[in-house]
């Protein structure tokens, strides 16, 4: 009902703007609708005019010229439907509801669109996607079409570039941190206190102190004392003597105290020249240079000798020129040149 009222109001507005009467507009609408039906039924122009005259619709009351009616009947026959708002919306929806897959296929059966990627990347897709945007829901369709393309571009090109940059930065950071660790280790070796020790002497000293601190076995001491009493008729070791020996060892241990120094400490020299530059001993220099990736000439020469060892050539047996190899033919003795028959 609301659509009918809006259509009647639209007719009154058209009549007021164009200077037409309401009945003329109504008659014109009837004629256009009638012509549209005849055109859809494949009638010719003469048959359409004959049908209009026989139907009793007065042409004099209409403001549409006969030539315009002929053009309308010959071309579309749907002027009334095309001028209405619902028909415009339906036509636009039909025009814009194309298949995006078919729009991208530039085949002979499809509408040809020139390549537009020479302007900027993605121009061809955008020109094809414009025809697939729904005017009734343009925001949602635009977001779906353009947003998906942007996401594909970011995950494809930009994503790979970002991943490549992250890998490069991570590798550079690892190399920088490793160099920093090597530098800290080299500086710690330069400022450390070095002590010269001998492992064999320390081992024997440890064993001597260990066995010296063991408690005396009463059974062995008693047996040793009885052996000497029987052999010499008197005791060489009294209980008081044994106790004095044990107490003397304990007193000596208290006086000496724990051994703090386990070797000879190497004296640390001050930087020469007074400029406080970095310095190291000669025996420590190859280790520090190796941490920084440099090699001393002696070390480089030794590595070169170990890596470039020539392969041993196979020795073939050689024979002297004067001696000939022995013949394997057996000796048959001396024969005459002329034989008798």
UniProtKB/Swiss-Prot annotation:
Residues 262-297 are annotated as: D1. Residues 302-341 are annotated as: DNA-binding. This is Minor capsid protein VP2. Residues 327-341 have a biased composition (Basic residues). One of its GO terms (cellular component) is viral capsid. One of its GO terms (biological process) is viral penetration into host nucleus. Residues 317-326 have a biased composition (Polar residues). Residues 310-341 are annotated as: Disordered. A motif (Nuclear localization signal) lies at residues 309-317. GO terms for molecular function: DNA binding; structural molecule activity. A lipid is attached at residue 2 (N-myristoyl glycine). Coiled coil: none annotated. Belongs to the polyomaviruses capsid protein VP2 family.
